[in-house]
Amino acid sequence: MSRMYETIYIVQPDLGDEEIKALSTKVQDVVAGMNGDFKRLEDWGTRKLAYPINKNPRGRYFYLRFDGDSGLIAELERRLRLDDKVIRYQSVKLETEVVAPAAAPVKSAEEGTEEVAAEAATEAPAETTTTVEV
């Protein structure tokens, strides 16, 4: 049964373009060789790591999305683990197709203050004064 997966892997930041292209081709070949359906490969660029990994304070991130089965995940992770250029990787199964949420409408500052004042007026109880004659 084919399921959708995504893998993020981090490589050493000092790799050249040819080495990165060879690694990306190798990853795509693993997916194709195991009858997977390759969807997307994105280069997220070099970023600072939360903590140094193998004395590297930075890493180059790659995002991979594909359809396949559990055997494909096992083989892909095995190949990433054996490659010295890859310093970390993580694969997860996606439940459904991920859709970006729609942006919330932005209110201007004047509209926001008027709405807050209107809400405060409706929520606050009206002050009543009673006069008592003696």
From Swiss-Prot:
Pfam families per UniProt: Ribosomal_S6
UniProt region (Disordered), positions on chain: 103-134
The organism's superkingdom is given as Bacteria
Record-level Gene Ontology MF annotations: small ribosomal subunit rRNA binding; structural constituent of ribosome
Q: What does this protein do?
A: Binds together with bS18 to 16S ribosomal RNA.
Sequence similarity: Belongs to the bacterial ribosomal protein bS6 family.
Name-wise, this protein is Small ribosomal subunit protein bS6
Lineage of the source organism?
A: Bacteria, Pseudomonadati, Thermodesulfobacteriota, Desulfuromonadia, Geobacterales
Q: Supply the gene name.
A: rpsF
